[in-house]
């Protein structure tokens, strides 16, 4: 369906944490990957997203930094949360081959209503999803 149509196949590990905060983190990760819409209002006004060499400051900059990069499928392998922090990791299938990803998410407080900062990692792998 194209880069903004969200016709991307998403699977989740059966052992994935299904707590409320972990589910919020997964929704944020899928939004950052361009696999789904980023949850409305989740970004703090001064949110900072560091993704590789790029740094996006502010909600509009984060939204403009979302690029699906020929994304075909996403597998969420892990989602963990504790206090004001959460992490989501898994595998991507892209037109350029398989990749691993991880999003480290820091919320403004333990209620996980707003994201203060995100650090994202992604790299190629030889193992497909």
Located regions from the model:
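Short, low-complexity N-terminal intrinsically disordered segments enriched in polar/charged residues
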Residues: 1-33, 45, 129
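A beta-strand edge to alpha-helix "cap/lid" segment located at domain peripheries
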Residues: 1-13, 64-129
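Small-side-chain structural scaffolding
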Residues: 25, 31, 47, 86-90, ...
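Broad hydrophobic/π-residue packing in well-ordered secondary structure
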Residues: 27-31, 41-43, 105-107, 113
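A solvent-exposed, acidic/Ser-Thr-rich amphipathic alpha-helical stretch
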Residues: 35-82
